[in-house]
Amino acid sequence: MSITVLFPTATEASLFQHPRVQTVISGVGLTATAHQTSKLIAQHRPDWLILAGIAGVYPHAGLAVGEVALVASELEGDLGFFTPQGFTHLAHLPLDMDFARRHTLHCPYVDAVSGFTLARGVSLNAAMAPFIDTSAVDIENMEGAAFFHVCLQENMRFLQLRAISNVALPGEDDWDMAGSVQALTDGLHRLLAQLGA
């Protein structure tokens, strides 16, 4: 079985090693992740593609810094327009245009593993953007929606694992980078063992 793990940064990958798993640094953000995910699928098409990184947690979510979550859904949160009523997601705008109105993307493979808390993610180009409705999500990151979209379009089996590094609030500077990277690494080894790696 071939498995590739994408990490947005070398920092997030720094503690991970596995003799039967390929690792790739995708780069931070939606654009870099879409490119690297597409490239990996086109050139290698592994049996599983996993995105692993840190994430911020919203105060209303039932997760704490240092916990690990399997991401069940993703939303590209800042895709839309500012209207007189405020920010409106592109999927909810009454535009007379013919295009795919995608909002929330779901991972159909989360049942392949067990023992992980499931989280709803939002991907943002601008972290902690104040105009985003976060009531229906738990965590934020900068890559997940692009990863989900490419994998779904290409019929690629995929999972996303995130370790909570901080509370996603402006001015909340109490990050646990070292602890979250360790938690991510430990969680990734548990996940890979369940996949048979």
What are these language model-derived features?
Residues L6-A10:
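Structural motif
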Residues M1-T4:
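Extreme N-terminal starter segment of soluble prokaryotic enzymes
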Residues T11-G196:
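Glycine-rich phosphate- or other oxyanion-binding loops that anchor nucleotides, phosphorylated ligands
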